[in-house]
Design a protein with these regions (language model features):
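Hydrophobic core register within WD40 beta-propeller blades
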Residues: 61, 101, 150, 208-211, ...
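Surface loop/turn motifs at the tips and blade-to-blade linkers of beta-strand repeat domains
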Residues: 50-56, 90-95, 135-142, 199-204, ...
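Beta-propeller domain segments
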Residues: 21-44, 147, 164-176, 181-184, ...
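Blade-loop segments of beta-propeller domains
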Residues: 59, 78-107
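Structural WD40 beta-propeller signal
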Residues: 55, 64, 104, 151-155, ...
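Asp-box/WD-like beta-propeller blade repeats and closely related beta-sheet repeat scaffolds
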Residues: 97-98, 114-153, 161, 202
Length: 378
Protein backbone atom coordinates (compact mmCIF):
# COMPACT_ATOMS: atom_id res chain seq x y z
CA UNK A 1 0.00 0.00 0.00
CA UNK A 2 1.32 3.46 -0.90
CA UNK A 3 0.95 6.29 1.60
CA UNK A 4 0.81 10.04 1.35
CA UNK A 5 1.52 11.74 4.63
CA UNK A 6 0.31 15.26 5.16
CA UNK A 7 1.63 17.65 7.76
CA UNK A 8 -0.38 20.28 9.45
CA UNK A 9 1.58 22.30 11.96
CA UNK A 10 2.77 19.50 11.29
CA UNK A 11 0.33 16.67 10.86
CA UNK A 12 0.46 13.69 8.62
CA UNK A 13 -2.01 12.00 6.34
CA UNK A 14 -1.72 8.54 4.92
CA UNK A 15 -3.18 8.12 1.48
CA UNK A 16 -3.45 4.68 -0.14
CA UNK A 17 -3.44 4.43 -3.90
CA UNK A 18 -7.17 3.85 -4.23
CA UNK A 19 -8.19 6.40 -6.83
CA UNK A 20 -6.97 4.85 -10.05
CA UNK A 21 -9.40 5.37 -12.87
CA UNK A 22 -11.55 7.98 -11.09
CA UNK A 23 -11.99 11.33 -12.82
CA UNK A 24 -13.11 13.61 -11.30
CA UNK A 25 -12.08 12.74 -7.75
CA UNK A 26 -14.48 11.02 -5.39
CA UNK A 27 -14.57 12.16 -1.77
CA UNK A 28 -15.45 10.88 1.66
CA UNK A 29 -15.78 12.50 5.08
CA UNK A 30 -13.64 11.13 7.89
CA UNK A 31 -13.33 11.95 11.58
CA UNK A 32 -9.97 13.49 12.43
CA UNK A 33 -8.94 13.57 16.11
CA UNK A 34 -6.52 16.15 17.49
CA UNK A 35 -5.98 16.94 21.17
CA UNK A 36 -8.86 14.60 22.04
CA UNK A 37 -11.27 16.56 19.86
CA UNK A 38 -12.75 15.12 16.67
CA UNK A 39 -13.67 17.09 13.57
CA UNK A 40 -14.88 16.01 10.12
CA UNK A 41 -12.47 16.34 7.20
CA UNK A 42 -13.22 15.79 3.52
CA UNK A 43 -10.56 13.83 1.64
CA UNK A 44 -10.36 11.89 -1.63
CA UNK A 45 -11.99 8.50 -1.23
CA UNK A 46 -9.58 5.95 0.23
CA UNK A 47 -7.23 8.55 1.70
CA UNK A 48 -6.57 9.18 5.40
CA UNK A 49 -5.43 12.31 7.21
CA UNK A 50 -3.00 11.89 10.12
CA UNK A 51 -1.17 14.17 12.51
CA UNK A 52 2.61 13.75 12.59
CA UNK A 53 4.55 16.23 14.74
CA UNK A 54 4.39 19.70 16.28
CA UNK A 55 6.79 22.49 15.38
CA UNK A 56 6.89 26.19 16.12
CA UNK A 57 5.33 28.03 13.14
CA UNK A 58 6.77 25.87 10.36
CA UNK A 59 6.55 27.19 6.82
CA UNK A 60 8.22 25.85 3.68
CA UNK A 61 9.09 22.16 3.43
CA UNK A 62 12.00 20.61 1.52
CA UNK A 63 13.21 17.04 1.20
CA UNK A 64 16.97 16.58 1.07
CA UNK A 65 18.39 14.08 -1.45
CA UNK A 66 18.83 11.49 1.33
CA UNK A 67 15.13 11.67 2.26
CA UNK A 68 15.37 13.84 5.39
CA UNK A 69 12.65 16.49 5.61
CA UNK A 70 13.49 20.12 6.42
CA UNK A 71 11.23 22.99 7.43
CA UNK A 72 11.92 26.68 7.65
CA UNK A 73 9.95 28.59 10.25
CA UNK A 74 8.69 31.96 11.31
CA UNK A 75 10.10 31.25 14.77
CA UNK A 76 13.71 31.22 13.55
CA UNK A 77 14.42 27.51 13.65
CA UNK A 78 15.35 25.38 10.69
CA UNK A 79 14.03 21.92 11.48
CA UNK A 80 15.32 18.53 10.36
CA UNK A 81 12.99 15.51 10.43
CA UNK A 82 14.55 12.15 9.59
CA UNK A 83 12.25 9.30 8.53
CA UNK A 84 9.60 8.42 9.70
CA UNK A 85 9.19 12.19 10.15
CA UNK A 86 7.57 12.07 13.59
CA UNK A 87 10.36 13.87 15.44
CA UNK A 88 11.55 17.41 14.70
CA UNK A 89 15.15 18.34 15.52
CA UNK A 90 16.49 21.90 15.38
CA UNK A 91 19.25 21.99 12.76
CA UNK A 92 20.05 25.64 13.46
CA UNK A 93 18.38 28.60 15.16
CA UNK A 94 18.67 31.83 13.20
CA UNK A 95 17.25 35.32 13.25
CA UNK A 96 15.94 36.99 10.11
CA UNK A 97 13.07 34.60 9.29
CA UNK A 98 14.62 31.48 7.71
CA UNK A 99 11.51 30.81 5.63
CA UNK A 100 12.83 28.09 3.32
CA UNK A 101 15.82 25.93 2.47
CA UNK A 102 17.17 24.13 -0.58
CA UNK A 103 20.09 21.83 -1.28
CA UNK A 104 22.84 21.51 -3.81
CA UNK A 105 25.93 19.36 -3.67
CA UNK A 106 27.75 19.84 -0.38
CA UNK A 107 25.70 22.72 0.98
CA UNK A 108 22.37 23.87 2.37
CA UNK A 109 20.84 27.14 1.14
CA UNK A 110 18.77 29.17 3.61
CA UNK A 111 16.54 32.02 2.43
CA UNK A 112 16.10 34.77 5.02
CA UNK A 113 14.37 38.10 4.54
CA UNK A 114 17.54 40.08 3.83
CA UNK A 115 19.68 37.51 2.09
CA UNK A 116 20.36 34.05 0.75
CA UNK A 117 22.79 32.17 2.96
CA UNK A 118 24.68 28.91 2.66
CA UNK A 119 26.55 26.47 4.86
CA UNK A 120 28.46 23.24 4.26
CA UNK A 121 26.13 20.27 4.65
CA UNK A 122 26.41 16.52 4.26
CA UNK A 123 23.48 14.06 4.18
CA UNK A 124 22.44 13.03 7.68
CA UNK A 125 24.19 15.95 9.38
CA UNK A 126 22.20 16.87 12.52
CA UNK A 127 23.53 20.36 13.31
CA UNK A 128 24.82 23.43 11.49
CA UNK A 129 26.84 26.01 13.40
CA UNK A 130 26.00 29.68 12.97
CA UNK A 131 29.71 30.28 12.31
CA UNK A 132 29.43 28.13 9.18
CA UNK A 133 26.57 30.19 7.72
CA UNK A 134 27.77 32.78 5.20
CA UNK A 135 26.00 35.23 2.93
CA UNK A 136 25.79 34.08 -0.68
CA UNK A 137 23.81 37.04 -2.02
CA UNK A 138 21.94 39.92 -0.41
CA UNK A 139 18.18 40.17 -1.00
CA UNK A 140 15.89 43.21 -0.95
CA UNK A 141 14.65 43.24 2.63
CA UNK A 142 12.30 45.39 4.66
CA UNK A 143 8.83 44.96 6.09
CA UNK A 144 5.73 43.55 4.43
CA UNK A 145 5.69 40.19 2.67
CA UNK A 146 9.04 39.35 4.20
CA UNK A 147 9.12 35.66 3.25
CA UNK A 148 11.75 34.47 0.80
CA UNK A 149 11.38 31.10 -0.94
CA UNK A 150 14.42 29.41 -2.48
CA UNK A 151 14.55 26.56 -4.97
CA UNK A 152 17.12 24.97 -7.26
CA UNK A 153 15.79 24.60 -10.80
CA UNK A 154 16.23 21.78 -13.30
CA UNK A 155 18.95 23.95 -14.84
CA UNK A 156 20.92 23.87 -11.58
CA UNK A 157 20.44 27.58 -10.96
CA UNK A 158 19.12 29.12 -7.73
CA UNK A 159 15.72 30.85 -7.81
CA UNK A 160 14.18 33.03 -5.09
CA UNK A 161 10.67 34.50 -4.90
CA UNK A 162 9.72 37.62 -2.97
CA UNK A 163 6.70 39.93 -2.76
CA UNK A 164 6.17 43.67 -2.79
CA UNK A 165 5.62 45.38 0.56
CA UNK A 166 1.92 46.32 0.43
CA UNK A 167 -1.19 46.07 -1.71
CA UNK A 168 0.17 48.75 -4.01
CA UNK A 169 3.86 49.57 -3.81
CA UNK A 170 5.91 50.89 -6.72
CA UNK A 171 8.37 47.99 -6.67
CA UNK A 172 9.52 46.01 -9.68
CA UNK A 173 12.14 43.46 -10.64
CA UNK A 174 13.88 45.36 -13.39
CA UNK A 175 15.85 48.36 -14.53
CA UNK A 176 15.17 51.78 -13.08
CA UNK A 177 14.50 50.58 -9.53
CA UNK A 178 16.83 50.69 -6.55
CA UNK A 179 17.99 47.32 -5.28
CA UNK A 180 15.72 47.38 -2.21
CA UNK A 181 12.73 48.13 -4.45
CA UNK A 182 13.41 45.20 -6.75
CA UNK A 183 10.63 43.06 -5.35
CA UNK A 184 7.51 41.32 -6.61
CA UNK A 185 8.47 38.22 -8.58
CA UNK A 186 11.10 35.53 -9.01
CA UNK A 187 14.83 36.15 -9.38
CA UNK A 188 17.60 33.83 -10.52
CA UNK A 189 21.17 33.97 -9.24
CA UNK A 190 23.99 34.51 -11.72
CA UNK A 191 27.16 32.82 -10.46
CA UNK A 192 30.56 32.07 -11.89
CA UNK A 193 32.03 35.46 -12.67
CA UNK A 194 32.98 37.17 -9.45
CA UNK A 195 30.32 38.15 -6.95
CA UNK A 196 26.94 36.41 -7.44
CA UNK A 197 24.22 38.78 -8.66
CA UNK A 198 20.45 38.54 -9.04
CA UNK A 199 18.70 38.72 -12.38
CA UNK A 200 14.93 39.18 -12.80
CA UNK A 201 13.18 36.07 -14.07
CA UNK A 202 9.47 36.95 -13.75
CA UNK A 203 8.00 40.21 -12.44
CA UNK A 204 4.66 41.79 -11.55
CA UNK A 205 3.73 39.22 -8.87
CA UNK A 206 2.49 40.75 -5.63
CA UNK A 207 3.46 37.85 -3.36
CA UNK A 208 4.55 34.62 -5.08
CA UNK A 209 5.28 32.43 -2.05
CA UNK A 210 5.28 29.02 -3.76
CA UNK A 211 6.82 27.86 -7.03
CA UNK A 212 7.76 24.59 -8.70
CA UNK A 213 8.71 23.17 -12.09
CA UNK A 214 6.38 20.88 -14.03
CA UNK A 215 7.97 17.39 -14.02
CA UNK A 216 7.31 16.78 -17.72
CA UNK A 217 7.71 20.17 -19.37
CA UNK A 218 10.21 21.81 -17.01
CA UNK A 219 8.08 24.98 -17.04
CA UNK A 220 8.04 27.07 -13.85
CA UNK A 221 4.71 27.82 -12.14
CA UNK A 222 3.98 29.98 -9.10
CA UNK A 223 1.16 30.92 -6.77
CA UNK A 224 0.44 34.60 -6.21
CA UNK A 225 -1.49 36.48 -3.53
CA UNK A 226 -3.62 39.31 -4.88
CA UNK A 227 -4.28 42.61 -3.07
CA UNK A 228 -6.98 43.28 -0.48
CA UNK A 229 -8.18 46.76 -1.45
CA UNK A 230 -10.67 45.73 -4.16
CA UNK A 231 -13.14 43.94 -1.90
CA UNK A 232 -13.79 40.34 -0.94
CA UNK A 233 -14.38 39.03 -4.47
CA UNK A 234 -11.72 40.80 -6.55
CA UNK A 235 -9.22 40.15 -7.89
CA UNK A 236 -9.04 36.35 -8.08
CA UNK A 237 -5.89 34.73 -6.74
CA UNK A 238 -3.46 33.53 -9.40
CA UNK A 239 -1.68 30.35 -10.40
CA UNK A 240 0.66 31.45 -13.15
CA UNK A 241 3.08 30.08 -15.70
CA UNK A 242 6.39 31.93 -15.46
CA UNK A 243 8.83 32.31 -18.31
CA UNK A 244 12.05 34.28 -18.58
CA UNK A 245 11.05 37.95 -18.70
CA UNK A 246 7.32 37.40 -18.15
CA UNK A 247 5.40 40.32 -16.60
CA UNK A 248 2.29 39.58 -14.54
CA UNK A 249 1.06 43.11 -14.00
CA UNK A 250 0.85 43.79 -10.28
CA UNK A 251 0.45 46.24 -8.71
CA UNK A 252 -0.37 48.38 -11.76
CA UNK A 253 -2.75 45.91 -13.42
CA UNK A 254 -5.22 43.30 -12.13
CA UNK A 255 -6.84 40.35 -13.88
CA UNK A 256 -10.55 40.23 -12.95
CA UNK A 257 -11.18 36.74 -14.30
CA UNK A 258 -12.03 37.99 -17.79
CA UNK A 259 -9.64 40.78 -18.67
CA UNK A 260 -6.72 42.83 -17.39
CA UNK A 261 -7.57 46.26 -15.96
CA UNK A 262 -5.53 49.24 -14.75
CA UNK A 263 -5.46 49.46 -10.95
CA UNK A 264 -5.41 53.12 -9.98
CA UNK A 265 -4.22 52.38 -6.44
CA UNK A 266 -0.70 52.75 -7.81
CA UNK A 267 -0.42 56.06 -9.64
CA UNK A 268 3.19 55.71 -10.75
CA UNK A 269 3.72 54.87 -14.39
CA UNK A 270 3.83 51.10 -14.97
CA UNK A 271 7.25 49.82 -16.00
CA UNK A 272 5.63 47.87 -18.85
CA UNK A 273 2.41 48.27 -20.84
CA UNK A 274 -0.84 46.41 -20.24
CA UNK A 275 -0.39 44.48 -23.50
CA UNK A 276 2.60 42.67 -21.98
CA UNK A 277 0.73 41.32 -18.94
CA UNK A 278 0.68 37.51 -18.74
CA UNK A 279 -2.66 36.29 -17.39
CA UNK A 280 -2.81 33.36 -14.93
CA UNK A 281 -3.46 29.85 -16.23
CA UNK A 282 -6.08 29.21 -13.52
CA UNK A 283 -7.42 31.25 -10.61
CA UNK A 284 -8.77 30.70 -7.12
CA UNK A 285 -11.48 32.84 -5.51
CA UNK A 286 -10.16 36.13 -4.15
CA UNK A 287 -8.62 36.28 -0.67
CA UNK A 288 -7.79 32.55 -0.57
CA UNK A 289 -4.08 33.28 0.03
CA UNK A 290 -2.38 30.54 -2.04
CA UNK A 291 1.03 29.80 -0.56
CA UNK A 292 3.12 26.69 -1.16
CA UNK A 293 2.75 24.35 -4.13
CA UNK A 294 4.30 21.17 -5.48
CA UNK A 295 3.77 19.01 -8.53
CA UNK A 296 2.74 15.40 -8.01
CA UNK A 297 5.69 13.26 -9.14
CA UNK A 298 5.29 10.01 -11.00
CA UNK A 299 4.34 7.20 -8.62
CA UNK A 300 2.92 9.44 -5.89
CA UNK A 301 -0.79 9.53 -5.02
CA UNK A 302 -3.18 8.30 -7.70
CA UNK A 303 -2.01 7.99 -11.29
CA UNK A 304 -4.78 10.39 -12.38
CA UNK A 305 -3.10 13.08 -10.26
CA UNK A 306 0.39 12.54 -11.65
CA UNK A 307 1.95 15.81 -12.79
CA UNK A 308 -0.94 17.86 -11.35
CA UNK A 309 -0.07 20.58 -8.82
CA UNK A 310 -1.13 20.59 -5.17
CA UNK A 311 -1.57 24.08 -3.70
CA UNK A 312 -1.93 25.14 -0.05
CA UNK A 313 -4.71 27.71 0.30
CA UNK A 314 -4.11 29.47 3.61
CA UNK A 315 -7.60 30.99 3.78
CA UNK A 316 -8.59 34.63 4.14
CA UNK A 317 -8.28 36.91 7.14
CA UNK A 318 -10.87 39.21 5.57
CA UNK A 319 -14.60 38.57 5.26
CA UNK A 320 -17.50 39.99 3.22
CA UNK A 321 -19.06 43.24 4.38
CA UNK A 322 -21.37 42.39 7.27
CA UNK A 323 -20.19 38.79 7.43
CA UNK A 324 -18.87 36.92 10.44
CA UNK A 325 -15.71 34.86 10.73
CA UNK A 326 -17.59 31.86 9.36
CA UNK A 327 -17.80 33.64 5.97
CA UNK A 328 -14.02 33.86 5.51
CA UNK A 329 -12.44 31.84 2.72
CA UNK A 330 -11.75 28.44 4.23
CA UNK A 331 -8.24 26.98 4.30
CA UNK A 332 -7.80 23.82 2.21
CA UNK A 333 -5.57 21.89 -0.16
CA UNK A 334 -6.51 21.94 -3.83
CA UNK A 335 -5.26 20.21 -6.96
CA UNK A 336 -4.61 22.16 -10.16
CA UNK A 337 -5.40 19.58 -12.82
CA UNK A 338 -3.22 19.41 -15.92
CA UNK A 339 -3.91 17.92 -19.33
CA UNK A 340 -1.25 17.62 -22.01
CA UNK A 341 1.06 19.78 -19.93
CA UNK A 342 -1.42 22.64 -19.45
CA UNK A 343 -3.54 23.62 -16.43
CA UNK A 344 -7.27 23.13 -17.04
CA UNK A 345 -9.16 23.40 -13.72
CA UNK A 346 -9.00 23.32 -9.91
CA UNK A 347 -10.40 20.53 -7.69
CA UNK A 348 -10.57 20.36 -3.92
CA UNK A 349 -8.21 17.83 -2.36
CA UNK A 350 -8.48 18.14 1.45
CA UNK A 351 -10.92 20.43 3.28
CA UNK A 352 -12.55 20.79 6.69
CA UNK A 353 -9.93 22.95 8.42
CA UNK A 354 -12.53 25.67 9.09
CA UNK A 355 -15.55 24.75 11.21
CA UNK A 356 -19.11 25.94 10.64
CA UNK A 357 -18.70 28.65 13.30
CA UNK A 358 -15.57 29.95 11.54
CA UNK A 359 -13.08 28.50 14.01
CA UNK A 360 -9.96 27.07 12.34
CA UNK A 361 -7.79 24.24 13.55
CA UNK A 362 -5.30 24.42 10.67
CA UNK A 363 -4.17 26.74 7.88
CA UNK A 364 -1.95 25.00 5.29
CA UNK A 365 1.25 26.83 4.40
CA UNK A 366 3.30 24.49 2.20
CA UNK A 367 3.20 21.06 0.58
CA UNK A 368 5.97 18.62 -0.39
CA UNK A 369 6.16 15.07 -1.70
CA UNK A 370 8.46 12.66 0.11
CA UNK A 371 10.53 9.79 -1.28
CA UNK A 372 7.79 7.45 -0.03
CA UNK A 373 5.30 9.09 -2.39
CA UNK A 374 3.62 10.73 0.58
CA UNK A 375 2.28 14.29 0.59
CA UNK A 376 3.34 16.39 3.57
CA UNK A 377 2.09 19.84 4.47
CA UNK A 378 2.76 22.43 7.14
Amino acid sequence: MNYVRIFLILWCAALPDALAGTEPLLYETQSFTLDNESTPVRVPKGYTLEWLVDMDRPRMLTFAPNGDLFAGSKSGEVYRLPPPYNKAEVLIDLSGYPHSVAFREGEILIARTNGLYRAPYQPGQTKVSRKEVTLLARLPGGFGHNTRTVGVGPDGRIYVSLGIQRNCTDQYLGEGYDFDDQRGGVMVLREGNGRPTWEPYASGLRNPVGFDWHPQTGVLYATNNGPDHLGFDQPPECFSKLTAGSFHGMPWFQFDGQQVNRDDCESDKPPRPIAEVTIPVVTFPARNAPLGMAFVPKGAMDEKLEFDAVVALHGSWGKPVGGGVETRRAPKLVAVRFKDGEAVRVDDLVSGFQLLDGDRWARPADVAFGPDGALYFS
